Amino acid sequence: MLQPARRKYRKEQKGRNTGVATRGNSVAFGDFGLKCTDRGRLTARQLEAARRAISRHVKRGGRIWIRVFPDKPISQKPAEVRMGNGKGNPEYYVAEIQPGKIVFEIVGVTEELAREAFRLASAKLPLRTTFVSRMIGQ
């Protein structure tokens, strides 16, 4: 699963996920992309499940890019622990997603195969997504 090799600080504040994606909002590496139209978080496990779904469908053909990285630690306190006594330990990592962000890209497959692979992958993700293709001349 994806996670940072090391961080300057183990824990991070919650923050607010606002605005729309101004970077990473167009297909840059592949021919087709999976774009999120919702705002939210994608965990490393969800990204890995979606990646496996794409890889299984396209088999040996095609090259896949994951355009987001889960670098934000989410802390949790253990079950049945009283409130207080500090912040919990980091349990998993998430990628904050704004509307318009490209999550996956693929090249080397037909449009029909890419559409079906991304449809299978989007079932693994908690956000609404749409299929996009590279603009002519890019």
Swiss-Prot record:
- Superkingdom assignment: Bacteria
Q: Where does the record place Basic residues bias?
A: 1-13
Record carries keyword Ribonucleoprotein: yes
Pfam families cross-referenced by the UniProt entry: Ribosomal_L16
- Recite the UniProt keywords alphabetically: Ribonucleoprotein, Ribosomal protein, RNA-binding, rRNA-binding, tRNA-binding
Biological processes, Gene Ontology terms: translation
One GO molecular-function entry: tRNA binding
Output the Gene Ontology cellular-component terms.
cytosolic large ribosomal subunit
Q: Where is the signal peptide?
A: none
Locate the region Disordered: 1-22
Query: Does tRNA-binding count among this protein's keywords?
Result: yes
* Task of the protein: Binds 23S rRNA and is also seen to make contacts with the A and possibly P site tRNAs.
Q: Which NCBIfam families would you find in this protein's record?
A: rplP_bact
Question: What's this protein's family per the entry?
Answer: Belongs to the universal ribosomal protein uL16 family.
Quaternary structure and partners = Part of the 50S ribosomal subunit.
Q: What name appears for this protein in its UniProt entry?
A: Large ribosomal subunit protein uL16
Name the gene behind this protein: rplP
